[in-house]
């Protein structure tokens, strides 16, 4: 897992050194402990703010050389906007903002976890710390020469808090979730010659150290199960396909598990229906759903979530070859349903079809959610701000929408219905793997729905959010790790919020 900045907690009364980070609202007021740490220099700071036209707007930053006579070299003041009720995602953002202003160096950094109204709560301070870690992430392990501006923050960062023990306790689970996001980012960012199905499965097996049971299904095992849809996708690759099933039991013995399923196309050329050359290199990220599931399982197991959870990922390469799947082929899925292949570049749904059926029938989960960089059509519809949400269960959909609002990993519900489902009927088989030009993300979801039986189910099309999305306060990486925080919050809301 990629290294990121080290964050710790110290008492609010600690004397600052090096770089000091403070917070103010639109009145430009500082907290009492911050003002004391600055030796009563608030008036001087207000004059500097006026000269810089800094008004304390939410996320704005005032960057100053420290006033003379104070034992710090630099002062960063971050605006929090109007005083009022700030959400967890706001403090995550503030942490990312301040980390973005810190250069690589050895100067100690102290962050005054204090608002003008008083000290931040342990939850607020821990969200701030998580935001710092997420923003500081870099994936540069293959660079032999690094520019100064590309270097990660190297100094340790101390958050000055009112209650150190409470802040550490609140941060522990958030730190594990952050580790899960970082793991997911690492997997998405890896080059495809390094991260192929067998290697991906090997990395997922490292979760055993956290008490996760990991089972790896090889090609003979999948053939025995009848996973013809998944195996058809990978038959043109020299790299054999894999399905990885991860089980974490943190809930009550005998309770139904919940399940998360990820599309893991480690590289997608499109197969015989080959993609254009432009930006094909981005298809190393077509396993963003599987990366999220592995990162999520890490987060849940490490923080000891109180739920029984299944994570399952189908891992393939979609390559053109003399043995590759052809348009016109008909394959038989594990469910027994037959599928006519119209376009070999609509492969992710074939992978998911068998894994969804396997999980639904073997584990009978309370609900299951799949994640996939499934369609370009969802990016046409929603851009890169929201993942597409499709569901056969309104309660599950509402819980996902709520978790998205709380974490900032937003989803937008899209329609399903028989009018769309009939578009994937085939003349020669039970169904075909594409439904035509229009409503492409919807017909892809309708295809998946045919493999979930009566299980409450949601599908997240993360093609616009998992990779190459616009950079944000908490993510400067090509691979975003989208979905780990969203689904961790869902598990928390469903199983732990009242415990």
From Swiss-Prot:
GO terms for biological process: proteolysis. InterPro entries: Leucine_aapep/pepB, Macro_dom-like, Peptidase_M17_C, Peptidase_M17_leu_NH2_pept, Peptidase_M17_N. The active site is at residues 275, 349. It comes from the Bacteria. Its cofactor is Mn(2+). Mn(2+) 2 binds at residues 263, 268, 286, 347. The lineage of its organism: Bacteria, Pseudomonadati, Pseudomonadota, Alphaproteobacteria, Hyphomicrobiales. It is an enzyme of class 3 (hydrolase). Keywords: Aminopeptidase, Cytoplasm, Hydrolase, Manganese, Metal-binding, Protease. Presumably involved in the processing and regular turnover of intracellular proteins. Catalyzes the removal of unsubstituted N-terminal amino acids from various peptides. HAMAP family: Cytosol_peptidase_M17. Its EC number is 3.4.11.1, 3.4.11.10. One of its GO terms (molecular function) is metalloaminopeptidase activity. Belongs to the peptidase M17 family. GO terms for cellular component: cytoplasm. Binds 2 manganese ions per subunit. Mn(2+) 1 binds at residues 268, 345, 347. It catalyses: Release of an N-terminal amino acid, Xaa-|-Yaa-, in which Xaa is preferably Leu, but may be other amino acids including Pro although not Arg or Lys, and Yaa may be Pro. Amino acid amides and methyl esters are also readily hydrolyzed, but rates on arylamides are exceedingly low; Release of an N-terminal amino acid, preferentially leucine, but not glutamic or aspartic acids. This is Probable cytosol aminopeptidase. It holds the Pfam family Peptidase_M17_N. It is found in: Cytoplasm.
